[in-house]
Amino acid sequence: MTPEQFLHRCKVICHVGPVGVWEQITKHGFRTAEQLILEADLTEEERQALLSTPRRESVRLSVRGDAVTLRDQGPLFARKDLKSILGDGLDASDWIHLLNQRVYFFTDETSMRKLLDKYLQIDGGQDVIWLSPLKLIEAAGLRLELTSQNTVTIARQSGAQKMADAFAPLWRFTDRKPTEATILGGLDDLSPVFRAERCFQDGRRQILT
């Protein structure tokens, strides 16, 4: 996929997080789960568990004195044996390591709204950050990686579904709409952000930037 094809396919790029995530992003950039876990106030045993096992529920961390929430990875528990859907010799800890190394962005508003509605029902509010696809390409460079599937959901089919090459750089991804856009290692440059808003369950919206 060329940059021009990406821009044609992806008119919308956005990130959804718990209330307060925008303030954290303005201070520290888009941080990966791995980065947050490594910086959090945890015992070494707790840290290693979070780095290598899926999160059945959301996890609250204290990072540099700030309260940070890591989303649950509940859909991965749809199978009793996660390894049964992993290919290329991956085990569960390998897959979780791959997931934790990246920040995730929606590439269409429909799928974003589905997750937003889910967490509005649970938490009452969420922060939504909108980014320019063009500026995201420029800021992320080769660290921008795309997927053809939701990397934390499991389809109702047998055989391997999650492979080592699930995250493909732009140049290796075929010309089709990606399911997810991810950035390996996070993103400090916030120039792609053009709007941030706080959404509430009752329909109210608060413009943050």
Per-region residue spans from a language model:
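Gly/serine-rich nucleotide phosphate-binding loop at the start of the catalytic core
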Residues: M1-R55
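Conserved NAD+-utilizing ADP-ribose enzyme module
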Residues: T2-H8, E44-V103, T107-T209
